[in-house]
Amino acid sequence: MGAHIFSAVVGATVVGGLISSAMALVAWRNRDRPAVAAFGWLMVVCAAWAFTSSARMLSQDPASAYLFDRFVRVASSSTTPLILVFVLSYTGRDALLTPRFVGLLWLVPTGYVLLSITAPFHALEPGPGSSGSVTNAGITAPVVPEGLPSDVDLVFTYVVLAVALLLLAQFLVRSRAIYRLQTTVVTTAILIPTIVNMATQFSDFSHPGIDLTPAALGVTALVLGWGLFQY
């Protein structure tokens, strides 16, 4: 049973990456529409997260798992800032997206990625020798431990997501009725991976080497794309 669940998670994650890739292509073809360019970049990063996460789960040795985990961290830490960029663009706050603001928004993710890449040279993040395989509930998968910078990035992620959701809630209240359904769809699309990520982080139902968030982002890609291009 565990092997079937693991295969299903990997398959769902790969499908999520394919869906995000397709949505990125659709966004490119419609890049002149409002907020679609930001949506396209978000989809590119979501696809990268899904594919690298799949590769990490399927890694046969700790060194490969650790390497793919570095790419996972680059993609995952960039997803939330891009969500906020998309929300600001969608709600008509493009004027806030100055180079200074965008640089500040990526300050924490950039620091996190640099500390992750340079982990062999300091003790803030576990190095390559820390990764290994763990068997839990019949599932055997690689596990790469995390350090304090990962916790800081996680807190930053939830703060940025909270800001994005508050901006959408404000826009929902103030917008005309014709846009309210679309805004509700956009908000739902962002809530889906947020809830899944929190469940993965704070509950014991999943294997420590499995993150369901990339698979959930495939659902986000479908819902968000439908919401943007349907209305």
Where are these regions (language model features)?
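Hydrophobic transmembrane alpha-helical segments in integral membrane proteins
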Residues: M1-I19, P149-T157
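Helix-loop junctions on the outward
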Residues: G2, A48-A75, S89-D94, T118-I139, ...
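Interfacial "cap-and-anchor" motif at the non-cytosolic start of specific transmembrane alpha-helices
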Residues: F6, V10, V36, G40-M43, ...
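Membrane-embedded alpha-helical segments of multi-pass membrane proteins
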Residues: V15-I19, F71-L82, F156-V159, A215-T220
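Internal transmembrane alpha-helix with an interfacial aromatic "cap," most often the third helix
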Residues: S20-W28, S77-W106, A162-A169
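Transmembrane alpha-helical segments that serve as helix-helix packing and pore/cofactor-lining elements
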Residues: A27-V36, P62-Y66, Y90-L97, L165-T184, ...
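The cytoplasmic-loop to transmembrane-helix boundary for the fourth helix
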Residues: T91-S150, Q182-T188
